[in-house]
Amino acid sequence: MSVNVLVVDDSKLARINAGKALCALQPDWQRLEAGSAAEAVDVMEREQVDVALIDFNMAERDGLSLAADLRERHPTMPIAIITANIQDEIIARAREINASFVAKPLTAEGLQGFLAGAALRLRTGG
């Protein structure tokens, strides 16, 4: 089964780092990229997206707002909010929309638990 992972971050370097970690952990999964929330919506309209990794702090729209919209359209999609801004309020908002929280700087070790859970959810259908 081909799995498409959408990496949303306004930092090209952060997208590259996420891609490296993703490739190390799930080499068969395909990476799609978006540099903004608007670009992410465009990608979602054109491509099948199975998993989303979304930066919290983006210029025109925060990642939690984007994640909430994705959750409405895709109730079982594994979604992770990635941020260096570790505040209880952000973690609580992520949990409200059933999104995981992954701390920056993103590492393979930090992403491993989320991707393992995502793989299980995709195999079991939700």
Over which residues does each language-model region extend?
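The feature encodes the CheY-like receiver
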Residues: 59
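Conserved phosphotransfer cores of two-component systems
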Residues: 45-47, 69-76, 97
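Two-component/phosphorelay signaling modules centered on CheY-like receiver
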Residues: 12-32
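Alpha4 helix (beta4-alpha4-beta5 surface) of REC/receiver domains from two-component response regulators
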Residues: 65, 86-102, 113
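Active-site residues of response regulator receiver
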Residues: 55, 83
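Receiver (REC) domain switch/active-site region of two-component response regulators
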Residues: 107, 116
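Acidic catalytic/metal-coordinating carboxylates
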Residues: 36, 62-66
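Acidic, metal-coordinating helix/loop segments flanking the phosphotransfer/catalytic sites
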Residues: 33-51
